[in-house]
Amino acid sequence: MTRFDSIERAVADIAAGKAVVVVDDEDRENEGDLIFAAEKATPELVAFMVRYTSGYLCVPLDGADCDRLGLPPMYATNQDKHGTAYTVTVDAREGIGTGISASDRAATMRLLADPSSGAQDFTRPGHVVPLRAKEGGVLRRPGHTEAAVDLARMADLRPAGVICEIVSQKDEGHMAQTDELRVFADDHNLALISIADLIAWRRKHEKHVERVASARIPTRHGEFTAVGYRSIYDDVEHVALVRGDLPGPDGDGSDVLVRVHSECLTGDVFGSLRCDCGPQLDAALDMVAQEGRGVVLYMRGHEGRGIGLMHKLQAYQLQDAGSDTVDANLELGLPADARDYGIGAQILVDLGISSMRLLTNNPAKRVGLDGYGLQITERVSMPLRANAENLTYLRTKRDRMGHDLIGLDDFEAGEML
């Protein structure tokens, strides 16, 4: 097993102007980035980064700074499979040459981190790629973009970093993997940390959800306890329907049956046949009730896979004209799936869950969860009901979004799968 260094060492190194190596989830990019604070950028640091990485140097910033500096998205529809939020590229307007040298790029990076700079201080396009970090950092999105901003903040520096992927020295056509990254870090006296450890550190030292209320909820599936939560970042309210006894945040909640269900007004409340959300919610409540112990976490703000109710209705309009559920979102300039599960993970941890059997047909829900102190011991398939209205939708989820719906074509609309 690869040895990782402490988060405390990495933060101290960032504060001192050194670079660190940060690796992400093996089910995500499974790559390591060199990261340092943008305000500490020097020609030597940039040259070192260029030598050992792909050379596509990016500067993660928080959203407020992106807005202040006039940095719109590089492309209106973000099609990056990991949702990396690239903005327009820039160079410093004054004091540099062509913009590509290590000295020039270091100057641009420092200017991006300077709170007194403005949009007028940059030319576009340029040789440095700013990125917009998700508010909430790695607790909302377990990416290198957010890790860089978090590390800078934790080091009491401006929330701006510099990142680039480290290239393998064994096979220069590919990126370095964890074992090689450990050797690289040791050779150059750099700290090696994982985003999972950074998430765990922040989760231990910070809190981003608050428990508001708890009440008994009798349902047709049985009796549950509804535990209400509020996200501190955006004030969105979520509900965990708990069956049986859970141990609380300091207990041993292992192998708990869990469904993380995304809000769907049309399917859950109106009984729309265009999706399978309503039947999945009913099935999850029934399965947890029969288990006698478990959680159905109802995530608000996930309507239409995170695009919102009105955008979802607009997407339906495009689907009526022939687009599928993925293309409809993209045609609206929206991601195919804009959901994040960081807040949901914090709620599950607050309920005392340490490991779970996850009720889902979507393998992507597993990505990044380990970093929240949660282990998925089993993925439990959900029963679905296909019908004439949602059969195409289900096939699109299987074929284009990776949902595990093997054998869907063998069933006629209306039969239980």
From Swiss-Prot:
The record marks 127, 165 as: Essential for DHBP synthase activity. Binds 2 divalent metal cations per subunit. Magnesium or manganese. Residues 1-204 are annotated as: DHBP synthase. Mg(2+) 2 binds at residues 29, 144. GO terms for biological process: riboflavin biosynthetic process. Signal peptide: none annotated. It catalyses: D-ribulose 5-phosphate = (2S)-2-hydroxy-3-oxobutyl phosphate + formate + H(+); GTP + 4 H2O = 2,5-diamino-6-hydroxy-4-(5-phosphoribosylamino)-pyrimidine + formate + 2 phosphate + 3 H(+). Gene3D superfamilies: DHBP synthase (3.90.870.10), GTP cyclohydrolase II (3.40.50.10990). Zn(2+) binds at residues 264, 275, 277. Its EC number is 4.1.99.12, 3.5.4.25. GTP binds at residues 259-263, 280, 303-305, 325, 360, 365. GO terms for molecular function: 3,4-dihydroxy-2-butanone-4-phosphate synthase activity; GTP binding; GTP cyclohydrolase II activity; magnesium ion binding; manganese ion binding; zinc ion binding. D-ribulose 5-phosphate binds at residues 28-29, 33, 141-145, 165. Residues 205-417 are annotated as: GTP cyclohydrolase II. GO terms for cellular component: cytosol. Keywords: GTP-binding, Hydrolase, Lyase, Magnesium, Manganese, Metal-binding, Multifunctional enzyme, Nucleotide-binding, Riboflavin biosynthesis, Zinc. HAMAP family: RibA, RibB, RibBA. Catalyzes the conversion of D-ribulose 5-phosphate to formate and 3,4-dihydroxy-2-butanone 4-phosphate. Catalyzes the conversion of GTP to 2,5-diamino-6-ribosylamino-4(3H)-pyrimidinone 5'-phosphate (DARP), formate and pyrophosphate. In the N-terminal section; belongs to the DHBP synthase family. This is Riboflavin biosynthesis protein RibBA. It comes from Rhodococcus jostii (strain RHA1). The gene is ribBA.
